[in-house]
Amino acid sequence: MARYIFITGGVVSSLGKGLASAALGALLQARGFSVRLRKLDPYLNVDPGTMSPFEHGEVFVTDDGAETDLDLGHYERFTGVAARSTDSVSSGRIYSTVLEKERRGDYLGKTIQVIPHVTNEIKDFIAIGDDEVDFMLCEIGGTVGDIEGLPFFEAIRQFTHDKPRGQCIFMHLTLLPYLAASGELKTKPTQHSVKELQSIGIAPDILVCRSEHPIPEKEREKIALFCNVRKEAVVAAYDLKTIYDAPLAYHEQGLDQAVLDAFDISPAPKPDLTVWRDVSDRVHNPEGEVKVAIVGKYTQLEDAYKSIAEALTHGGMANRVKVIVEWVDAEVFDTQDVAPHLEGFHAILVPGGFGERGTEGKIKAAQYAREHNVPYLGICLGMQMAVIEAARNVANIKAAGSEEFDHEAGKKRFEPVVYHLKEWVQGNAKVSRRVGDDKGGTMRLGAYDAALTPGTRVADIYHTSAIDERHRHRYEVDIKYRAQLEDAGLVFSGMSPDGKLPEIIEWPNHPWFIGVQFHPELKSKPFDPHPLFADFIRAAKENSRLV
């Protein structure tokens, strides 16, 4: 039976609960324990799949096709444990399930209420896989006191009550604001946050206090006294130069030991932090630097491309270089020349996205990379834009475009080199879709196999002829244009096993130009960089010597 750690937050949002959870998971693994991390989000959306990246940041896709919170990306990157659909839930999903059961008559005519029906559904979700791991870490989204989070707080209170004593603990993240005028940290917001938590029946066992300044021993004792926790359980969380310092920093502050003490695990296994020391060394001691331009649509919010930014960092670690990322708004190229914005970059990456806005700029970025021999990685829409660019400017299909843009405009304007994907094979079943289907959960989602063409660049990079990668798209390069594009020199180097869906394209006469329909960034880790990103940065490093 798993031990449960519930992670909550107070005072303000965006304190870093996800990173703290991921770092703690990594530290417990370093001591020989198995872990699984979960995220419970109070918002009423069923999942983040239809939410704007400006609202929510990126959508992290699991192998089994769940569209989840970006924190699950942190969980995977720090622990190496592949997330599942059962590791993420929202109020919307919980309420939807409860209402479906009510319609089926599962509740036998009873009045449906938040307590017990909604809270029971949350508790059932938390308990999934109870016997699979040593520790289950459950992060509650939002902050204590938010009205939409109350059912989740009540559910974890009940869950802890139902379990044997010592089976569950609570870890609460707060902020210690610093007043420059008086030159002191203020503990009152933390005290009030804990008081709010206690008022709903939850007493934190560990306090993680975010601070920009060292926490004096006197203040630590004060927090412990008024929040009713041991002094050793008041853990400082300071701002770091890189998130990959978090496991070592939290270990230095005693977080993992405080957790083991709270569970009365003694003697505690000693941690092996060799991997994280190596990661930290690679981040802090690069032997050079490369500049990568990300030409995207949501560049005002870096969290919209969180996994891509991290995967580039991982590629830098693999090559002992610092990757300097600059965000370029693709719409700028609608009215301005590409060259002044992209000159001096050692590589160009065009990420995924939806809608026509900014796509002409992405096509121009792909053209610039092709014509100027700049390493190019196109992901999802970035691959589609590279194919459209090749069709227009090399294969002489002047009206080449995407059905997505025609659907958005309500009229036919392009020859659809990229079309709406209406059916595909998933496992042993055929999946069908129509243009008018609901948006949520109707894309080609999750891990799919692909066959690589021997002798191609991607086959050399992967060192295999068969791969599986995660997808999130409803538009696809039309296979009927393959012959025309290959006659122009483009190579379709990766295909779905049935040979119907192009997964990877490349220009063989280019130093490094690859487009992939999937999202390789979702499987990259600091201690195991994705091979595409590692080789992309290798090519950028090589190009940096030529620029």
Swiss-Prot record:
Gene3D superfamilies in UniProt: 3.40.50.880, P-loop containing nucleotide triphosphate hydrolases (3.40.50.300)
Positions annotated to bind UTP: S13, K186, T187, K188, P189, T190, Q191, K222
Chain residues that bind L-glutamine: G353, L381, G382, M383, Q384, E404, R474
Residues binding CTP: S13, D146, I147, E148, K186, T187, K188, P189, T190, Q191, K222
Function summary: Catalyzes the ATP-dependent amination of UTP to CTP with either L-glutamine or ammonia as the source of nitrogen. Regulates intracellular CTP levels through interactions with the four ribonucleotide triphosphates.
Protein name: CTP synthase
Note, other: CTPSs have evolved a hybrid strategy for distinguishing between UTP and CTP. The overlapping regions of the product feedback inhibitory and substrate sites recognize a common feature in both compounds, the triphosphate moiety. To differentiate isosteric substrate and product pyrimidine rings, an additional pocket far from the expected kinase/ligase catalytic site, specifically recognizes the cytosine and ribose portions of the product inhibitor.
One example GO MF annotation: glutaminase activity
EC number(s) recorded for this UniProt protein: 6.3.4.2
Domain Glutamine amidotransferase type-1: from-to ranges: 291-546
PANTHER family named among the record's database cross-references: CTP SYNTHASE, CTP SYNTHASE-RELATED
Activity regulation, free text: Allosterically activated by GTP, when glutamine is the substrate; GTP has no effect on the reaction when ammonia is the substrate. The allosteric effector GTP functions by stabilizing the protein conformation that binds the tetrahedral intermediate(s) formed during glutamine hydrolysis. Inhibited by the product CTP, via allosteric rather than competitive inhibition.
Gene designation per UniProt: pyrG
Region (Amidoligase domain) location: 1-265
Keywords on record: ATP-binding, Glutamine amidotransferase, Ligase, Magnesium, Metal-binding, Nucleotide-binding, Pyrimidine biosynthesis
Catalytic-site annotation from UniProt: C380, H519, E521
Cellular compartments per GO CC: cytosol
Record-stated family: Belongs to the CTP synthase family.
